[in-house]
Amino acid sequence: MEKLTDLNYTLSVITLMNSTLHTILEDPGMAYFPYIASVLIVLFTLHKASIPTMKIALKTSKCSYKVVKYCIVTIFNTLLKLAGYKEQITTKDEIEKQMDRVVKEMRRQLEMIDKLTTREIEQVELLKRIYDRLMARSTDGIDMTKEINQKNVRTLEEWESGKNPYEPKEVTAAM
């Protein structure tokens, strides 16, 4: 544990890596050297950061399997992001959460469809009742006297004097 947190040890490992890389890749025209060095530095940093973190987490956590799984998934997701991939590794818990969310949304939509279907059925039944009432009445013998308020209208023969009192009369006015 002392070596993991010792700064001199860390610096000596970085120096050793740099010298090893320089001896392996002596060609000055090597175009991929900065990329290889970056990947190795990231891997070394992940190594130095993850081991002490996992040791502490395993000692303090009640469920060590979940901690290890989460650390490994996080490390792989970081490496995938560095490599330029947009996909990520998901754990079973995350998949179950997403599935629960999808199932919940599907249930909500099914309830809405059920409500809409019920309303549509009620509207169709109402339209059918209206149609049945319209078709049940016959249009031949409808008494329109009630509709136009002409129930007490008399014909010319029914007037007492035989003349219509509402007809205009000739009136002469003095000038």
Swiss-Prot record:
<keyword id="KW-1043">Host membrane</keyword>
<keyword id="KW-0472">Membrane</keyword>
<dbReference type="GO" id="GO:0005576">
    <property type="term" value="C:extracellular region"/>
</dbReference>
<comment type="similarity">
    <text>Belongs to the rotavirus NSP4 family.</text>
</comment>
<keyword id="KW-1038">Host endoplasmic reticulum</keyword>
<feature type="topological domain" description="Cytoplasmic">
    <location>
        <begin position="52"/>
        <end position="175"/>
    </location>
</feature>
<feature type="binding site">
    <location>
        <position position="123"/>
    </location>
    <ligand>
        <name>Ca(2+)</name>
    </ligand>
</feature>
<feature type="glycosylation site" description="N-linked (GlcNAc...) asparagine; by host">
    <location>
        <position position="18"/>
    </location>
</feature>
<comment type="function">
    <text>The secreted form acts as an enterotoxin that causes phospholipase C-dependent elevation of the intracellular calcium concentration in host intestinal mucosa cells. Increased concentration of intracellular calcium disrupts the cytoskeleton and the tight junctions, raising the paracellular permeability. Potentiates chloride ion secretion through a calcium ion-dependent signaling pathway, inducing age-dependent diarrhea.</text>
</comment>
<keyword id="KW-0407">Ion channel</keyword>
<feature type="topological domain" description="Lumenal">
    <location>
        <begin position="1"/>
        <end position="28"/>
    </location>
</feature>
<feature type="transmembrane region" description="Helical; Signal-anchor for type III membrane protein">
    <location>
        <begin position="29"/>
        <end position="51"/>
    </location>
</feature>
<keyword id="KW-0260">Enterotoxin</keyword>
<dbReference type="Pfam" id="PF01452">
    <property type="entry name" value="Rota_NSP4"/>
</dbReference>
<keyword id="KW-0735">Signal-anchor</keyword>
<keyword id="KW-0964">Secreted</keyword>
<feature type="binding site">
    <location>
        <position position="120"/>
    </location>
    <ligand>
        <name>Ca(2+)</name>
    </ligand>
</feature>
<dbReference type="GO" id="GO:0044155">
    <property type="term" value="C:host caveola"/>
</dbReference>
<keyword id="KW-0479">Metal-binding</keyword>
<keyword id="KW-0800">Toxin</keyword>
<keyword id="KW-0812">Transmembrane</keyword>
<keyword id="KW-0325">Glycoprotein</keyword>
<dbReference type="GO" id="GO:0044169">
    <property type="term" value="C:host cell rough endoplasmic reticulum membrane"/>
</dbReference>
<dbReference type="InterPro" id="IPR002107">
    <property type="entry name" value="Rotavirus_NSP4"/>
</dbReference>
<dbReference type="GO" id="GO:0039520">
    <property type="term" value="P:symbiont-mediated activation of host autophagy"/>
</dbReference>
<protein>
    <recommendedName>
        <fullName>Non-structural glycoprotein 4</fullName>
    </recommendedName>
</protein>
<keyword id="KW-0406">Ion transport</keyword>
<dbReference type="GO" id="GO:0016020">
    <property type="term" value="C:membrane"/>
</dbReference>
<keyword id="KW-1072">Activation of host autophagy by virus</keyword>
<comment type="subunit">
    <text>Homotetramer. Interacts with the immature particle in the viroplasm. Interacts with host CAV1, early and late in infection. Interacts with host integrin ITGA1/ITGB1 heterodimer. Interacts with host integrin ITGA2/ITGB1 heterodimer. Interaction with microtubules blocks trafficking to the Golgi apparatus.</text>
</comment>
<keyword id="KW-1182">Viral ion channel</keyword>
<dbReference type="GO" id="GO:0015267">
    <property type="term" value="F:channel activity"/>
</dbReference>
<dbReference type="GO" id="GO:0090729">
    <property type="term" value="F:toxin activity"/>
</dbReference>
<keyword id="KW-0106">Calcium</keyword>
<feature type="glycosylation site" description="N-linked (GlcNAc...) asparagine; by host">
    <location>
        <position position="8"/>
    </location>
</feature>
<keyword id="KW-0945">Host-virus interaction</keyword>
<keyword id="KW-1133">Transmembrane helix</keyword>
<dbReference type="GO" id="GO:0046872">
    <property type="term" value="F:metal ion binding"/>
</dbReference>
<keyword id="KW-0813">Transport</keyword>
<dbReference type="GO" id="GO:0034220">
    <property type="term" value="P:monoatomic ion transmembrane transport"/>
</dbReference>
<dbReference type="GO" id="GO:0016032">
    <property type="term" value="P:viral process"/>
</dbReference>
<comment type="function">
    <text>Plays an essential role in the virus replication cycle by acting as a viroporin. Creates a pore in the host endoplasmic reticulum and as a consequence releases Ca(2+) in the cytoplasm of infected cell. In turn, high levels of cytoplasmic calcium trigger membrane trafficking and transport of viral ER-associated proteins to viroplasms, sites of viral genome replication and immature particle assembly.</text>
</comment>
